[in-house]
Amino acid sequence: MVPQTETKAGAGFKAGVKDYRLTYYTPDYVVKDTDILAAFRMTPQPGVPAEECGAAVAAESSTGTWTTVWTDGLTSLDRYKGRCYDIEPVPGEDNQYIAYVAYPIDLFEEGSVTNLFTSIVGNVFGFKALRALRLEDLRIPPAYVKTFSGPPHGIQVERDKINKYGRGLLGCTIKPKLGLSAKNYGRAVYECLRGGLDFTKDDENVNSQPFMRWRDRFLFCAEAIYKAQAETGEVKGHYLNATAGTSEEMIKRAVCAKEFGVPIIMHDYLTGGFTANTSLSNYCRDHGLLLHIHRAMHAVIDRQRNHGIHFRVLAKALRMSGGDHLHSGTVVGKLEGEREVTLGFVDLMRDNYIEKDRSRGIYFTQDWCSMAGVMPVASGGIHVWHMPALVEIFGDDACLQFGGGTLGHPWGNAPGAVANRVALEACTQARNEGRDLAREGGDVIRSACKWSPELAAACEVWKEIKVEFDTIDKL
């Protein structure tokens, strides 16, 4: 037998309570390439040292508990314990610290986001010695990344499937989100797609309600897709929300979508759960379906600056769990999102290798080992006047979704879609010609209005609409 390595917690067992920092605060620790690293924003209770809080976070999210236990001597804590290896004060904040914790890779089940989160963001967030705790970032080492399949297809395969290159994709969430019959819903989908959109979308809370059962919606939306494709010669899609009360029902809906021949389905990954999401992602990969991911419930988790989980962590988790699209905020619309922070996690969704950059909130260098990227989706309170900023911010590999900004057009859904398509192509062309959309975007839109009455009408309706509030979660 291999002799056990004694640790301070296991040497000469003596019942009682010890400071966490005696075992779990190790400022001399050298981080391993295989360690999973976490950056926590801590707010200790008055009188509690930051080192004790950091050690408590490391302990309670790995091998530790509130008292010494004799079974510590039956394993090697040096091998399995989490370690708080650095603490730094948060500039400009009283009594807030960033605690860096390293976790041995063997603490986590391969390919399981559920197990990863159960440990790292589990009971420790209710720990009394902490007034507040927020997980700001994770470093997922290549050795652990390779245990995940990631997105079903990824950005490049999606473009190949729908045969669309050189510009962002256009979408629209059908409104009103609740209350339409399946046939009227399908009619709205058809009008938007024939007008020039690439995709339309179920809202996140459209599942299978009495006014519109899921199978009826799937059928009429599939009919709308085929009709619009025949008229336009373009590949079209509608994000059919397969989210359901059970995983079995969710897969049944995905099977139906596949049988109807539609290209893409949808899941609410936070309310549905990581286990269900990974199962659905695996089905989509095996059966050629794209998977659009909505982040409903995210703001409950990520919006407060000092407690919860930052969205960059939730975005990394989705990339591992699996999804081809993910809602990521707009910067310019009605939903929360600071520019540099948003661009930081958009890069974490799309790119293979992202350097540490604290100016964008990225605490660790992340290597995705060629895992397929996730296309960011900008949605929420945007309209044609926002198009130059959206193209400048997100580039081509993004889906820009205008719900009210399409369906609110004074002439109807199809003209609303035309207006958005014209605006997108005008801004893309202007950017490709070297024009500065940040400065000249308004001129680009006004020029395009001269040969698109649909765009001119949209610009007149929304010329005074702005959503300007301070961002709560700032760097």
Curated annotation (Swiss-Prot):
Active-site residue list: 175 (proton acceptor), 294 (proton acceptor)
Which reaction(s) does its UniProt entry say it catalyses? 2 (2R)-3-phosphoglycerate + 2 H(+) = D-ribulose 1,5-bisphosphate + CO2 + H2O; D-ribulose 1,5-bisphosphate + O2 = 2-phosphoglycolate + (2R)-3-phosphoglycerate + 2 H(+)
Gene it is expressed from: rbcL
| InterPro entries found in the cross-reference section | RuBisCO, RuBisCo_large_chain_AS, RuBisCO_lsu_C, RuBisCO_lsu_C_sf, RuBisCO_lsu_fd_N, RuBisCO_lsu_N_sf, RuBisCO_lsuI
Q: Which UniProt keywords apply?
A: Acetylation, Calvin cycle, Carbon dioxide fixation, Chloroplast, Lyase, Magnesium, Metal-binding, Methylation, Monooxygenase, Oxidoreductase, Photorespiration, Photosynthesis, Plastid
Residues forming the propeptide are: 1-2
Family, per entry: Belongs to the RuBisCO large chain family. Type I subfamily.
Q: Give me the segments passing through the membrane.
A: none
* Annotated GO MF terms: magnesium ion binding; monooxygenase activity; ribulose-bisphosphate carboxylase activity
* This enzyme's EC code(s): 4.1.1.39
Which positions are annotated as binding Mg(2+)? 201, 203-204
Q: Which cofactor does it need?
A: Mg(2+)
Q: Which GO terms describe its biological process?
A: photorespiration; reductive pentose-phosphate cycle
Subunit annotation = Heterohexadecamer of 8 large chains and 8 small chains.
**Organism, scientific name:** Chlamydomonas moewusii (Chlamydomonas eugametos)
Q: Which residues carry this modification: N6-carboxylysine?
A: 201
Miscellaneous note of the record = The basic functional RuBisCO is composed of a large chain homodimer in a 'head-to-tail' conformation. In form I RuBisCO this homodimer is arranged in a barrel-like tetramer with the small subunits forming a tetrameric 'cap' on each end of the 'barrel'.
Q: Where does substrate bind?
A: 123, 173, 177, 295, 327, 379
Main EC class of this protein?
Answer: lyase
Location of N-acetylproline modifications: 3
PTM-bearing positions, type N6,N6,N6-trimethyllysine:
14
Its protein name is Ribulose bisphosphate carboxylase large chain
CDD domains on file: RuBisCO_large_I
How is the co-factor bound, per the entry?
Binds 1 Mg(2+) ion per subunit.
Q: Output the HAMAP family linked to this UniProt entry.
A: RuBisCO_L_type1
